[in-house]
């Protein structure tokens, strides 16, 4: 493996450990905050006063910082799929700390994620680093990528303005869709900023270029939007479901965006590209197994208690509406 790819690999793995842990810390913080004030899923910001939520935020920031540097050294097609490791971390911790059980099929899902990640690492392409932020800007303003951005923003606006009020509290794809679409743009801008910082540290200053600051503005806007809707998703839905669904959507969209903007697969033979895709599909399969395991458990709980299952989360556990409740 190339030296730069090796550095990116180590940083990506470390990032996954921190980010996976942060999901659990933030989840526990959100549950505590929801018990004393308006929940984040309903527009509340009580969690900002909860120390445990801030501990999760700090952990996530450390993980994202490691991820940020990883994108400087390695292509998105290598770094992004390794985020599956954070799902394993969060699933295991959720099993012990949130009492969200991880059964045999869940373990199989974790193993699939690891196997797929290894295949991707072995066949990852070596990235050609741009020589200036202007060169990155030229990549970002090519017609194909501009069309991608236009489609992305149209979908995000539709989700926020139309679908969130309509079904945001019952359909996980609304909140996660917004996070993932904005997340793909975040990665592209963060990668541009990282390369600009690297070039500046090597003596080729990129600070004076207006394109550098445009990328910073895009990154800040996208990150803030991601955080708002990720908090809503975590507060409304089960953490063991949010993590894999977010990963699948975010990773897929990021790889698509990177392939369009940076042409990651240019120069690779068909066998290597096919191997990477197979590895990616294996990882996706693992995350879907984890997701399916959680859904099966929830349906069983609903059946055992003769209740209707509501996909939303209460302040304590899954929100179940009993047929025999005196309220109904």
Curated annotation (Swiss-Prot):
Q: Which InterPro entries match?
A: Mg_trans_NIPA
Q: What is its main location?
A: membrane
Sequence intervals crossing the membrane? 5-25, 52-72, 77-97, 105-125, 143-163, 176-196, 210-230, 241-261, 270-290
Keyword Transmembrane attached: yes
GO biological process: one example? defense response to virus
Q: Name one GO molecular function term.
A: magnesium ion transmembrane transporter activity
Q: So which stretches are on the Cytoplasmic side?
A: 26-51, 98-104, 164-175, 231-240, 291-328
Query: GO cellular component terms?
Result: early endosome; endoplasmic reticulum; plasma membrane
The set of disulfide-linked cysteines is: none
Q: Which UniProt keywords apply?
A: Cell membrane, Endosome, Ion transport, Magnesium, Membrane, Transmembrane, Transmembrane helix, Transport
Q: Where in the cell is it found?
A: Cell membrane; Early endosome
Does the UniProt entry include the keyword Transmembrane helix?
yes
Looking up Pfam families in the UniProt record yields: Mg_trans_NIPA
Note the topology in the membrane.
Answer: Multi-pass membrane protein
Q: Which residues lie on this side of the membrane: Extracellular?
A: 1-4, 73-76, 126-142, 197-209, 262-269
Purpose:
Acts as a Mg(2+) transporter. Can also transport other divalent cations such as Fe(2+), Sr(2+), Ba(2+), Mn(2+) and Co(2+) but to a much less extent than Mg(2+).
Binding partners and assembly: Homodimer.
The family note in this entry says: Belongs to the NIPA (TC 2.A.7) family.
Q: What is this protein called?
A: Probable magnesium transporter NIPA6
- Source species, please? Arabidopsis thaliana
């Amino acid at each position: 493996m190339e030296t730069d790819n090796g550095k990116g690999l180590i940083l990506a793995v470390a990032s996954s450990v921190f980010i996976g842990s942060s999901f659990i810390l933030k989840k526990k913080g959100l549950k505590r905050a929801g018990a004393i004030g308006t929940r984040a899923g309903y527009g509340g910001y009580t969690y900002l006063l909860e120390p445990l939520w801030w501990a999760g935020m700090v952990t996530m920031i450390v993980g994202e910082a490691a991820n940020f540097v990883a994108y400087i050294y390695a292509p998105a097609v290598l770094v992004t799929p390794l985020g599956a490791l954070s799902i394993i971390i969060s699933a295991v911790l959720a099993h012990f700390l949130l009492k969200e059980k991880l059964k045999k099929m869940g373990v199989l899902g974790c193993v699939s994620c690891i196997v797929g990640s290894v295949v991707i690492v072995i066949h990852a392409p070596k990235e050609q680093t741009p020589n200036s932020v202007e060169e990155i800007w030229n990549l970002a303003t090519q017609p194909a990528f501009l069309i991608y951005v236009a489609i992305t923003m149209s979908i995000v606006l539709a989700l926020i303005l139309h679908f969130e009020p309509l079904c945001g509290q019952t359909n996980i794809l609304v909140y996660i869709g917004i996070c993932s679409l904005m997340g793909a743009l975040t990665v592209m801008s963060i990668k541009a900023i990282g390369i600009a910082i690297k070039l500046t540290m090597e003596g080729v200053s990129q600070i004076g270029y207006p394109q550098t600051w445009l990328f910073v503005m895009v990154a800040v806007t996208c990150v803030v939007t991601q955080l708002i809707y990720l908090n809503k998703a975590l507060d409304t839905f089960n953490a063991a479901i949010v993590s894999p669904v977010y990963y699948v959507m975010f990773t897929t969209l990021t790889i698509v965006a990177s392939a369009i903007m940076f042409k990651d697969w240019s120069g690779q033979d068909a066998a290597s590209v096919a191997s990477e895709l197979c590895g990616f599909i294996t990882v996706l399969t693992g995350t879907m197994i984890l997701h399916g395991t959680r859904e099966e458990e929830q349906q069983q709980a609903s059946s055992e208690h003769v209740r209707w299952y509501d996909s939303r989360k209460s302040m304590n556990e899954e929100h179940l509406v009993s047929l025999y409740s005196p309220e109904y």
